[in-house]
Amino acid sequence: MDDSWPDPRTGVKSPNAYPYFDAEPDDGYDGDVRRRGRRRRWGRVLLALLVVLVLLAIGGYFYLDSRLKRESALDYPGRLADTPGTNWLVVGSDSRAGLSRQQRKDFATGKAAGRRTDSMMLLHTGAGGTTLVSLPRDSYVPIPGHGSNKLNAAFAFGGPKLLVRTVEQATGIRIDHYAEIGFGGFVGMVDAIGGVEMCIKEPMRDPKAGLNLKAGCQNLTGGQALGYVRTRASARADLDRVDRQRQFFGALIKKSSSPGVLLNPFRSIPLALNGTGNFLVDDGDHLLDLSRMMWSMRGVSGGDGVTTTVPIGGAGSSPAAGAYITWDRTKALQLFNALKSDKAVPKSVITK
């Protein structure tokens, strides 16, 4: 009886041809099969890892987006028609939420409840470039339903919605997005990235803001940074303060978006959690919008754009508002008309 089997590789019958009893040296056929099998397994593993990473990224985005606080700020009857480009109203409030009792004492924030505007900036991006304009809180402007008063009074009277309405009517520019952060969120963001380096020209001391800084370049902690952007203890008071606020926010955004922070999970994760947990945006805004805003501010701080304050015309006082400042109507109109038309801002209206 012929018990030989055809060799599947050569077709020649041989007693040892059956694969299970093949004693001949490996000629590479089985090795090729094993290598191809290993490659397929590694391919499936890499594909599975890629799918997991994509799902984590998507899940992380929606989780962080859900942490944003939201409030209707852009919905009121009779709004201005849309204007070209994209416009953000960026507000720093004096909300103490998120600060411990000891922090309130250390940072000299007081115990006031609620929130009031401590800084306001208009960020415009479009074909005419990117422009960041400080709106001093002591600006004397008409507030719908409340006569004329300081700009920050609009927030006190009616929150973000009335503030947006007041800014739109004072500038003629339609606001597309709103972002607000309080004291606690600001301190947390600065500390999450390990502080922000600033170069101080001369010593700064202001007990009312919990500030005591020496001259020179130094890394400011969250508490020191809060005092730095709050203090009005200088010759030009609020006008000096808005300059420092633009300067510091630019440095904060620049460091937050640097590879040293984004690629370091011990920095990027606390920053993302702290930022999204403390930012308040309009109920139509999302994390992607906020990321675009921060990227635009990063460009401005890097010199790719214009930073300025509304041209100031003078000062005054009234029983209702107390001391206030007024805008230079001619120059302010030129500034806002340029932004409203999405054109480059004339150099003659840029103030430093």
Protein language model features and the residues they cover:
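Non-catalytic, solvent-exposed segments at the cell envelope interface
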Residues: 2-352
